[in-house]
Design a protein with these regions (language model features):
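Active-site activation/catalytic loop segments of kinase-like enzymes and analogous catalytic loops
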Residues: 259, 266-318, 332-349
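Active-site catalytic-loop/activation-segment of kinase and kinase-like phosphoryl-transfer enzymes
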Residues: 194-232, 309, 340
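Conserved protein kinase catalytic/activation segment
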Residues: 251-261
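Short Lys/Arg-enriched alpha/beta "domain-start" segment
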Residues: 1-27
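Protein kinase catalytic-loop region centered on the HRD/HxD motif
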Residues: 187, 234-241
Length: 362
């Protein structure tokens, strides 16, 4: 089989610009004409269900898998099929079996996946889908999460729902999103605790992140001096806690009466160990505001739509405890990340985050 030839076409493979020099099969189990494998591609580990040609067929043939590669952690059995794939742009593969959602993680890293870790500790929060179980395997003495199951909650993708309101108002939905985000943050703070670090430490991390982005997109270098000045203006102690880490409209589901936050793995480009560190909850707030701004730039959407939605989200989240200076810092950080992404992937879109960068720096 030629995994190297096919994996470069998969959305979950994030190293498309790198030449594949080595593919090592770490674990495998055959199921008729397909094989479930953990394959180390260069330095990263991926879970695949491949045919004889090395092409991944997990979404189409998952019913063939009776038990996976790992140990199942749950009071109940692994859900039986038939499975219906949830289509969409995902870095993992999610399927539905009755009232259960099964998520196969694709890029496998050491440690309990934060999607499992966080959600299993806040099952009573009404704005998340409770975890039912997960499967993991031990490699080199460390646990690696392979699969998780959650209660399936039907809903509409938050991004798609937002775009259906472009000729009207998204304000009430945004307010509900703010309330949902605050509810999840409070639940995580209660369960995992809070801490604080000097503002200088936060600034150092943001500057290091910016320098990494400049390596990816040298065009950002002209904004470095001004951005560093904004970061260095932070003073005092910054409150930290466990957060979502990659919150945007597409990481939410709109049900009949509320919003559900999904995919708590954090920013995919960051190492898993880094994604599990406490961070400011305003990083999540900034991520959602940036997502609203993107939606506000689509055809038919008016500037007023975005402004009203932003205000409503902050009202729902609770502005009494919100540090506007710190929020602006995280908006700048997110927008700089978006500029680097758009330069390398969708240059026609770079004006959207670039406007946000200039607005904060002005």
């Amino acid at each position: 089989m030629s995994i190297a030839e096919h994996i470069v076409n998969e959305r979950f493979y994030g190293a498309k610009s790198q030449t594949i020099t080595d593919v090592d099969i770490v674990l495998e189990k055959e199921y008729g004409e397909h094989t479930l494998v953990l394959a180390r591609v260069n330095d990263a580990l991926y879970q695949l269900f491949v045919d004889s040609e090395g092409c991944d067929r997990l979404a189409d043939h998952v019913d063939e898998i009776r038990e996976g590669l790992g140990v199942w952690h749950s009071e109940g059995p692994f859900p039986e099929g038939p499975y219906k794939p949830l289509r969409g742009e995902q870095s993992n593969t999610s399927l539905v079996a009755g009232d259960v959602m099964v998520k196969y993680f694709r890029k496998i890293e050491p440690g309990l996946n934060p999607d499992v870790e966080l959600l299993s500790r806040i099952p009573d929060c009404p704005h998340v889908a409770p975890v039912l179980g997960y499967a993991s395997t031990e490699l080199d003495g460390e646990e690696h999460t392979l699969v998780m199951t959650q209660q399936f909650i039907p809903g509409t993708d938050g991004w798609k729902h937002a775009l259906t309101t472009v000729t009207g108002s998204f304000a009430e939905d945004a307010r509900m999103l703010g309330e949902a985000t605050a509810s999840v943050h409070m639940a995580l703070a209660r369960e995992f605790g809070t801490s604080s670090v000097p503002a200088e430490t936060v600034a150092d991390g943001l500057i290091a992140r910016l320098d990494g982005l400049i390596k990816q997109a040298p065009e950002l270098a002209e904004y470095r001096e001004a951005a560093v000045a904004v970061y260095r203006e932070l003073r005092g102690e910054i409150d930290l806690q466990r957060i979502h880490g990659d919150l945007h409209l597409g990481q939410t589901l709109r049900t009949a009466d509320r919003y559900i936050l999904i995919d708590f793995e954090g920013e995919p480009a960051r190492p898993l160990a880094e994604r599990k560190l406490p961070d400011s909850p305003l990083r999540d707030v900034a991520g959602m505001l940036r997502s609203i701004d993107y939606a506000a730039h689509f055809d038919g959407t008016h500037e007023q739509w975005g402004a009203e939605a932003t205000t409503a989200f902050l009202e729902g989240y609770g502005t009494m405890e919100l540090d506007q200076q710190l929020l602006d810092v995280y908006i700048l950080d997110k927008a700089l990340y978006e500029v680097a992404y758009e330069i390398n992937n969708r240059p026609d879109w770079v004006h959207i985050p670039l406007a946000a960068v200039k607005q904060v720096l002005s």
